[in-house]
Amino acid sequence: MNQGFTAAATLLALLLYLIVSLNVMEARRKYEVRAPATTGNEHFERAYRVQMNTLEQMAFFLPSLWLCAIFLSDLAAAIGGIVWIGGRTLYALAYIHDPASRGRGMMISFVTQIALEADVFSRQTLPCCVCRPGRAVRGR
């Protein structure tokens, strides 16, 4: 199976993480927050929270993305990946500008991630015939 589109979406997600990490490095320099400190300036803390939240979300997103590619399709996973990356980008830009405005980007990426997970779950783990066409109900 070829999962080139999913691989490209994965690389873009990693590029996004690299960019938010570099943003933290720049904020440390600009606002004079020396490592290992994670507090000290509001603008630095925003950049740091974006990086940490993105890392936290990637721990769930990447496995979901690849399971979707394997069990559904490469294209469907890649589309979900691009939407997730767009949501995370919107989240990052909004949070750095004004933390109260981060909701739209957060919801886009969250709903996309849940959709990827729900699709894989419904296709691979639920035993009912409705969810898994061509499969008999267990116990019959």
Predicted regions and their residues:
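Small-residue-rich segments of transmembrane alpha-helices in multi-pass membrane proteins
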Residues: 2, 42-45, 105-121
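Alpha-helical transmembrane segments
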Residues: 5-19
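Cytosolic, membrane-interface loops and tails of multi-pass inner-membrane proteins
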Residues: 22-49
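Core segments of transmembrane alpha-helices
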Residues: 53-65, 113
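Mid-chain, well-packed structural core segment of small domains
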Residues: 61-63, 68-93
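Interfacial loop-to-transmembrane junctions
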Residues: 90-114
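Juxtamembrane boundary at the C-terminal end of a transmembrane helix
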Residues: 120-132
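Short, intrinsically disordered C-terminal tails of secreted or membrane-associated proteins
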Residues: 133-139
